[in-house]
């Protein structure tokens, strides 16, 4: 598959400022606020000038049940902190309550995360962009009828299902430290989606992703798992990622790629145990981008939130082929980035337990499996189903969904200041022990509340009505003429 260097590609970016207001609760490592921090940082780097920014629609229950079971989505719509006692049996059944708590606005949070990923897939399908970015998406642990690892609705599966309407083969790549179990499970028996996950394996959540898990039925050999040990560094990661992904591209020949960019694989993550720098992590983005395929970039885990914001800002710049300085610009959360106030981070001195021999052995085993694939399986394409977001078809009688607007918003925090710290009594700079790791359910990214100078809207009719009263949310809007 042909690779290109330095080809500038059109990028669109999905963000809703409300996402940063949702709050999982005291001491919970998943902080949607990190999405707002990311957004604010990339705004202050000026990256908004180089891409189209959209506010996603809120995905509805009908969209979510394209994958999830009706009763599970009905439960997510109904459950609230004030009625939990009425749902105790269902909470147990759907694995909601501990790692996946009930919090105010839970379903709306899922709607925003999912809406951005599905809208991104529609944009890619219509060839209206080359790369779509939704840092609030990437919630890869959610199952068909179960929440898991801080994830409730699997926006990735729903986005891939949307891409499959136009693409014969879709490749999913996961560089989060946790195994992408929810996505693998959804497509385990199909040859139209290949899932590739590089993750920590052994005494670690979710406990899946063995080298020998390769898919089943028609999907045999279409699941690729690279189990890793603690402390992998940039050099080792690049040495496995590039050859494995080159072979996958050669054998599978996808026509679209979804890349989950979980940043808990970075050095110093509160729940992680890898030793990647932001540059090392972003090399994966750069390499996948070089294949010049329609690409969806999603968030995922990441629990040291200052580094999450650094990482996803830098990876947005990589998508835009734009170099940004290491000196951080002043931004609303500048104090979080002390004491150095730099974009890039240094690796720690932790031991890399992944020996060259171990990595080579796993790589060769994966190559053997990939050689079992038929070259680019043919797929009988059916009539293309309706797009998930019909209003994007641009009915002339409706308001222009692409009008530019300027949004000033006062972002009020829904928690005390210390809630946004990285350590929270759970060991500043200290890694959790393995028993905690098992319990430490993966954290997936949600959105933020800051709005940007130029933001495009993609909304349903219902939401257009709501938008007529922006003051209800403390948001001032004015149309900005292009």
Swiss-Prot record:
Kindly list the positions annotated as binding Zn(2+). 176, 178, 264
**GO biological process, alphabetically ordered:** cellular response to platelet-derived growth factor stimulus; chromatin organization; chromatin remodeling; circadian regulation of gene expression; DNA methylation-dependent constitutive heterochromatin formation; embryonic digit morphogenesis; endoderm development; epidermal cell differentiation
Organism superkingdom:
Eukaryota
Q: Which residues carry this modification: N6-acetyllysine?
A: 74, 220
Query: Which residues are reported to carry the modification Phosphoserine?
Result: 393, 406, 409, 421, 423
Bias category Basic and acidic residues: which stretches?
401-416, 443-482
Crosslink (Glycyl lysine isopeptide (Lys-Gly) (interchain with G-Cter in SUMO)) position: 444, 476
Per its record, the protein catalyses:
N(6)-acetyl-L-lysyl-[histone] + H2O = L-lysyl-[histone] + acetate; N(6)-acetyl-L-lysyl-[protein] + H2O = L-lysyl-[protein] + acetate; N(6)-(2E)-butenoyl-L-lysyl-[protein] + H2O = (2E)-2-butenoate + L-lysyl-[protein]; N(6)-[(S)-lactoyl]-L-lysyl-[protein] + H2O = (S)-lactate + L-lysyl-[protein]
- Record's keyword terms, sorted: Acetylation, Biological rhythms, Chromatin regulator, Hydrolase, Isopeptide bond, Metal-binding, Methylation, Nucleus, Phosphoprotein, Repressor, S-nitrosylation, Transcription, Transcription regulation, Ubl conjugation, Zinc
What result follows from mutating residue 423 to A? Answer: Strongly decreases deacetylase activity, and disrupts interaction with NuRD and SIN3 complexes
Q: Which residues carry this modification: S-nitrosocysteine?
A: 261, 273
Q: Give the result of residue 426 to A, as annotated.
A: Decreases deacetylase activity, and disrupts interaction with NuRD and SIN3 complexes
Chief subcellular site?
Answer: nucleus
The record's GO CC annotations read: chromatin; cytoplasm; cytosol; heterochromatin; histone deacetylase complex; neuronal cell body; nucleoplasm; nucleus
User: Where is the PTM N6-methylated lysine found along the chain?
Assistant: 432
Post-translational modification (record): Sumoylated on Lys-444 and Lys-476; which promotes enzymatic activity. Desumoylated by SENP1.
Where do the segments described as Histone deacetylase lie?
9-321
Q: Which residues form a coiled coil?
A: none
Q: What does the record give as the active site?
A: 141
Q: What role does this protein play? A: Histone deacetylase that catalyzes the deacetylation of lysine residues on the N-terminal part of the core histones (H2A, H2B, H3 and H4). Histone deacetylation gives a tag for epigenetic repression and plays an important role in transcriptional regulation, cell cycle progression and developmental events. Histone deacetylases act via the formation of large multiprotein complexes. Acts as a component of the histone deacetylase NuRD complex which participates in the remodeling of chromatin.
Q: Family, per the entry?
A: Belongs to the histone deacetylase family. HD type 1 subfamily.
User: What name does the UniProt record give this protein?
Assistant: Histone deacetylase 1
According to its UniProt entry, this protein's organism is: Homo sapiens (Human)
Classification lineage: Eukaryota, Metazoa, Chordata, Craniata, Vertebrata
């Amino acid at each position: 598959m042909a690779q290109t260097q330095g080809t500038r590609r059109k990028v669109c970016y999905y963000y809703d400022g409300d996402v940063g207001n949702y709050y999982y609760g005291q001491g919970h490592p998943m902080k949607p606020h990190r999405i707002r921090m990311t957004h604010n940082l990339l705004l202050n780097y000026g990256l908004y000038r180089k891409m189209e920014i959209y506010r996603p629609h809120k995905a509805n229950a009908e969209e979510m049940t394209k994958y999830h079971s009706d009763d599970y989505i009905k439960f997510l719509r109904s459950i609230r902190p004030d009625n939990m006692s009425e749902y105790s049996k269902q909470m147990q059944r759907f694995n909601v309550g501990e790692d996946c708590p009930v919090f105010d606005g839970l379903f709306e949070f899922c709607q925003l995360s999912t809406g951005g990923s599905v809208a991104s897939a529609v944009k890619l399908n219509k060839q209206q962009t080359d790369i779509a970015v939704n840092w609030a998406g990437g919630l890869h642990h959610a199952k068909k009828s179960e929440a898991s690892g801080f994830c409730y609705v699997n926006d990735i599966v729903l986005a891939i299902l949307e891409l499959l309407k136009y693409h014969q083969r879709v490749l999913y790549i996961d560089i989060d430290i946790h195994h992408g179990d929810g996505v693998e499970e959804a497509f385990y028996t199909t040859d139209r989606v290949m899932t590739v996950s590089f993750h920590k394996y052994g005494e670690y959540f979710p406990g899946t992703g063995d080298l020998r898990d390769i898919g089943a039925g028609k999907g045999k050999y279409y699941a690729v798992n690279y189990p890793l040990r603690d402390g992998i560094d940039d050099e080792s990661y690049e040495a496995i990622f590039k050859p494995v992904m080159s072979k996958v591209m050669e054998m599978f020949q996808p026509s679209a790629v979804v890349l989950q960019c979980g940043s808990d694989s970075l050095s110093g993550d509160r729940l992680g145990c890898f030793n990647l720098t932001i540059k090392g992590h972003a090399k994966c983005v750069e390499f996948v981008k070089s294949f010049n395929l329609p690409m969806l970039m999603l968030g995922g885990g990441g629990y040291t939130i200052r580094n999450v914001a650094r990482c996803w800002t830098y990876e947005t710049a990589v998508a835009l082929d734009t170099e940004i300085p290491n000196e951080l610009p002043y931004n609303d959360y500048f104090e979080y980035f002390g004491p150095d106030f730099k974009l890039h981070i240094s690796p720690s001195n932790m031991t890399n337990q992944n020996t060259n021999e171990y990595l080579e052995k796993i790589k060769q085993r994966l190559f053997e499996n990939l050689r079992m694939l038929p070259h680019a399986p043919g797929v009988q394409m059916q009539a293309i189903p309706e797009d998930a977001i019909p209003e994007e078809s641009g009915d002339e009688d409706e308001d222009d969904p692409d009008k530019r607007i300027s949004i000033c918003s006062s972002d009020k925090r829904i928690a005390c200041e210390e809630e946004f710290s990285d350590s929270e009594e759970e060991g500043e700079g200290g890694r959790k022990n393995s028993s905690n790791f098992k319990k430490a359910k993966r954290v997936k990214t949600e959105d933020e509340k800051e709005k940007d100078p130029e933001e495009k809207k993609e909304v349903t009719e219902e939401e257009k009505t709501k938008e007529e009263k922006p003051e209800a949310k403390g948001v001032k809007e004015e149309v900005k003429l292009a």
